[in-house]
Amino acid sequence: VGSEMCIRDSAYVWRVNVGRISLYLLDTDNEMNSEFDRSITHQLYGGDWENRLKQEILLGIGGILTLKKLGIKKDIYHCNEGHAALINVQRICDYVAEGLTYDQAIELVRASSLYTVHTPVPAGHDYFDEGLFGKYMGGYPSRMGISWDDLMDLGRNNPGDKGERFCMSVFACNTSQEVNGVSWLHGKVSQEMFASIWKGYFPEESHVGYVTNGVHFPTWSATEWKHLYAAHFDENFLYDQSNPKIWEAIYNVSDEEIWKTRMVMKNKLIDYVRKQYRETWLKNQGDPSRIVSLLDKINPNALLIGFGRRFATYKRAHLLFTDLDRLAKIVNNPDYPVQFLFTGKAHPHDGAGQGLIKRIIEISRRPEFLGKIIFLENYDMQLARRLVSGVDIWLNTPTRPLEASGTSGEKALMNGVVNFSVLDGWWLEGYREGAGWALTEKRTYQNQEHQDQLDAATIYSILEQEILPLFYARNKKGYSEGWVKTIKNSIAQIAPHYTMKRQLDDYYDKFYIKEAKRFKMLAADGCAKAKEIAAWKEEVAEKWDSIEVVSCEKTEDLVKGSIESGKEYTITYVIDEKGLNDAIGLELVTTYTAQDGKQHVYSVEPFNVVKKEGNLYTFQAKHKMENAGSFKVSYPVSYTHLRAHETRHDL
């Protein structure tokens, strides 16, 4: 597939069959390219910013060209991360080549595009200098039917600001009708993060929504657990995985069977750990007496806590090691033995993450932690599977609210592993009392070091006072009935809500169906509706500044800014629409000042059109404040086109 850039590159297209789904991979390592360009796809995120831009051009523009070559044309295009945002450049070019104007093409592209943002961390949002971006994208504006400045402005928070770089995430927002985060909290964070794109609106008014991530049950549930579920759950379980009623059957499974399954998986993990540690130690020519001592100390009857993930600094893998004296006391308690398994990798350019791994390894080799703190090398999917199915507790300690979703804990709970996490990402929604443990989502200190110290102390206290006593409250059969109850609660009350099936159902119901209907309407009859809306917007833009507020009537209390709660007030505006014919709407927006000092939306109420006389429209709203307090009120005017748009915004 050749992509028309300033430098023409070619890519092999490889197809991987993932179940019944075809995954297409683009590969520039072929003899048709220069030696330099053959390396574009050698490493994910590899090279400098220029190579990063090449990768994103290949993924976005090359991806659409690949689908065209393969004869694949779909109604909806789902852009995961801003890295793929340039799909909409090529899609606009294709529509313009078919005879549409840019304004008509962007209506079709927006209506059929969904952008999912996966992280609030700045490293996940790429910005490119105008010079570098123009080197490879300079030929595209003419094909899109716009100017170079117009293209750059689509990627800027502040259109017209020549000093602002092109942001892929902003471009994705500006060319997608729907945008979503990957958990409820991340959706809220994303509304704040992207608020500057849609000026004049509060973040809460944004159309940015959410779909909380789930995990693929057949992939991440161990065979032993699949057999248990198959034996006790409804026969249609796999086809109805997100049905909570089916999962409640876990309460009918005997405690002995639950505990036996957990111990089988735990022993498999410990055998794997011993084997890997022995091989790694011998490879590194370590002291044989130390490896023997370490392996002897791994106790299958001890509480086993796992921590495995990418070692980004916001994941706070260091948190457990804040107070080493207290940690040593916990892991060396002869009555309540506990062991920690750590594994993960840091980004090649993340020196802080690599340093953190080094520190954990150094701590694990200290005499008081030998065999109690274990770091496993070569983190991969196989090790991840063993870890999320073999430990007793899955620990997650991100800095709030930087964990967009997280999925490792979801994988663990499918295997009867109990979560202990900060209330961030998916766990903010998933946590149920009696089905796991949580650190509060509220910050106590603005100083991150102080917050880390508090969170670490909380982890130690919950371990000492709640988790360890419950785990070791063993009956005559050798297990804790309270612990098994916690496992059952976790599976019954949380697991059904975090399957991939539920996630896909949410995307289908919230976005795919809505966009498919919208796109079908706009594309029908030679794109007649898209052309109509584009023409309507052009007319509104020409006359917008001439719209005039003729009069405003409010009660005296409203004018003074002091109103009585529970009492209804009437506000009336007369507006001259200057011949736009039902083009505008008026709303009453009430806001309050939160503890963070920011204004937040309390309510949004539409005005009703109660009278029309030529171009004069009389808008009226009846307003009643039910609660006392200090509020601000505004009356924003917006334009509407109800026949084509289901959202308040012109996006």
Residue ranges and their predicted role:
Residues V1-E4, R8-R643, R648:
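Catalytic cores of carbohydrate-active enzymes across secretory and cytosolic contexts
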